[in-house]
């Protein structure tokens, strides 16, 4: 007897659902790369999950649910359960004497042994085959019990044997009408009163359990059928049908049709009257006239001449007129100019501005001139203009350095006027020399800083090297 090396993971989990299962050893025994991938992430009573580990775990759960995942069975007790069942089936097969039943049961045992000899076995298949074996064996036992209880007398003796009838309380008239003894081969049926009938004795038989089909029965399913020589004679008798009650014997000829859901039936047509049939018939049609049909027909309409009946031709088109000769004489240019000037003046008077004239020029495609600022325009504050330019991010122009003192005095003279808009820059122009000196000092300071920076960096490097040497010496 060869023991199995693998078993179903689903069966193992169902059998050990109340036991504590260690995740590490369990995943090492399960066959498949998914279980090994998840088992590598198990350690220190914790599981480290990433995307790949979760996908492998879901695939393993799907295989376990579909009963396609297997695991190693190290203990021999886990695989000896089916072999013990197989031994019990063999013991039951020894007592089977019928050749047909023995052949069918032996084929089931051969299929179970073939499944147990392979390395990978599905417990569901073995359980289905075991159920088929016990089902066929129960059928064989039920047939054997029925055959053992049938009488062994000859057919002639069976016809002379009468079945015992139970004594039922019948009225005296019925008991008097019954014969004293009726042979079995000629039964005489007597109709008892309503709802009272006799039932023959039925032979005791074992209750046969209903055959329950399995969910994965093989295609070569077999059904045990006994041979003709072992067929059991049917000794059952159907009880007589009780007579109909009194209220059902006489059924009315017409059935009520006014029940709910019944379709109404149209009444039959009334019968013909008993009077003479000729009086009720319609009068005959009038006879045709005896005159000639051709003379009675109206004459056809006269033929119309198509040439005379055509509509008249359309009228001729109007004559062509020369546009040059038909145009009116032009109006005097002087009068035309006066009218245009009057219209423009009226438009300017009504509108109050030159917008209409500007629009007309734009429509005519003329090049417009730039508008000249008005002489009396309000003066703008230079400070506000400067601030607005700074806010807008415009680049300010640099001040021109005045080298000649005479030019500076001339500028001051030009600026120092009675106009208030020009006297605002007086203070700024007088401080030009001081501003230029400050700019020169700022440039000298930047040059000094630029020259000192390499020296400072060289000094810092020496100090850093000295510090590192001191640290090493310490």
Swiss-Prot record:
Any matching Pfam family: WH2
Low complexity: bias regions: 152-162, 255-264
Region (Disordered): 152-328, 366-385, 434-474
Domain named WH2: residues: 354-371, 382-399
SMART domains: WH2
Biased composition (Basic and acidic residues): 227-237, 434-460
InterPro entries, per database record: WH2_dom
Biased amino acid composition, Polar residues: 163-184, 204-217
UniProt keyword terms in alphabetical order: Repeat
GO molecular function, one term: actin binding
Pro residues biased stretches: 310-320
Chain's role: Probably plays an important role in the persistence and survival of the virus. May be a structural component in the envelope of the polyhedron or the envelope of the polyhedra-derived virus (PDV).
Protein name: 61 kDa protein homolog
Organism: Orgyia pseudotsugata multicapsid polyhedrosis virus (OpMNPV)
């Amino acid at each position: 007897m060869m023991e199995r090396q693998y078993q179903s993971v689903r069966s193992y989990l169902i059998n050990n659902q109340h036991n504590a299962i260690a995740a590490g050893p369990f995943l090492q025994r399960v066959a498949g790369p998914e279980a090994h991938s998840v088992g590598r992430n198990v350690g220190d009573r914790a599981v480290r999950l990433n995307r790949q580990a979760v996908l492998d775990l879901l695939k393993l759960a799907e295989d376990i649910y579909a009963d396609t995942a297997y695991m190693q069975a190290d203990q021999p007790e886990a695989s000896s359960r089916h072999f013990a069942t197989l031994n019990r089936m063999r013991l039951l097969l020894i007592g089977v004497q019928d050749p047909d039943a023995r052949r069918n049961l032996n084929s089931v045992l051969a299929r179970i042994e073939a499944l147990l000899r392979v390395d990978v076995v599905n417990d569901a298949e073995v359980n289905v085959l075991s159920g088929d074996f016990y089902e066929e064996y129960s059928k064989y036992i039920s047939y054997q019990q029925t055959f053992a209880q049938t009488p062994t007398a000859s057919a002639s003796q069976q016809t002379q044997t009468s079945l015992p009838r139970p004594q039922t309380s019948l009225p005296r008239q019925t008991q008097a009408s019954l014969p004293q003894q009726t042979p079995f081969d000629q039964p005489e049926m007597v109709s008892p009163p309503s709802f009272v009938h006799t039932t023959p004795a039925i032979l005791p038989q074992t209750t046969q359990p209903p055959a329950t089909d399995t969910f994965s029965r093989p295609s070569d399913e077999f059904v045990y059928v006994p041979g003709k020589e072992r067929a059991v004679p049917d000794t059952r008798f159907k009880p007589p049908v009780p007579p109909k009650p009194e209220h059902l014997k006489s059924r009315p000829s017409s059935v009520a049709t006014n029940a709910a859901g019944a379709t109404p039936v149209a009444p039959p047509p009334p019968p013909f009257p008993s009077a003479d049939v000729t009086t009720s018939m319609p009068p005959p049609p009038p006879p045709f006239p005896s005159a000639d049909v051709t003379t009675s027909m109206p004459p056809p309409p006269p033929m119309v001449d198509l040439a005379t009946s055509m509509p008249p031709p359309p009228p001729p088109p109007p004559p062509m007129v020369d546009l040059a000769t038909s145009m009116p004489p032009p109006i005097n240019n002087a009068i035309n100019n006066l009218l245009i000037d009057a219209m423009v003046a009226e438009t300017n008077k009504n509108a109050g501005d030159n917008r209409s004239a500007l629009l007309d020029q734009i429509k005519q495609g003329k090049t417009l001139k730039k508008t000249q600022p008005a002489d009396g325009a309000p003066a703008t504050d230079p400070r506000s203009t400067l601030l607005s330019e700074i806010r807008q991010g415009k680049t300010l122009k640099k001040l021109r350095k005045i080298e000649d003192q005479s030019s500076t005095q001339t500028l001051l003279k030009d600026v120092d006027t009675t106009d208030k808009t020009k006297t605002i820059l007086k203070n700024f122009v007088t401080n030009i020399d001081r501003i230029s000196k400050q700019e020169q000092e700022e440039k000298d300071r930047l040059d000094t800083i630029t020259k000192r920076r390499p020296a400072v960096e060289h000094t810092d490097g020496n100090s850093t090297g000295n510090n590192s040497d001191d640290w090493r010496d310490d």
